Amino acid sequence: MKTILALSLLAAPAFADCPAGTDYSSQIATVVERMQAAPHEGAARVLSAQMWDIWLDAPDELAQAMLDAGTASIQMGDRMVATSHLEELVAYCPDYAEGYNQRAFASFLQGKYDDALVDLDAAIALQPVHLGALTGKALTLIELGRAADAQ
């Protein structure tokens, strides 16, 4: 019985649907506008942190747990485990840009630049002003020897 319960919990993401999540587009647009008018770098950094708070807010608790596990694994240097968690997140929430961005980061750290680029393009398609994904794409293109494309 315990085995069945454990297997059902592991399979939950395969049977669940990720909710649409909160539409933060107006808040992001406001933060971008304020960043462009920031009087100095310090003010822009505060606003950048606000954007990260928005992007790191997953659509539901399950997605948040997957994201948190992935980012914690990245921080601990276990990039393969991070990739596994983030693959689950992307499969569960294919419309959540930060899942792709974090998986791209894990790929980048493993030197898998082509994989990172695919995920960064997906994140940018979902969230065109995702500064983390845009910056990550530029850095990835540089690593691929495509510095001219990074500009």
Placement of each model-derived feature along the sequence:
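Canonical positions in the second alpha-helix
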Residues: E88-L89, A122-A123
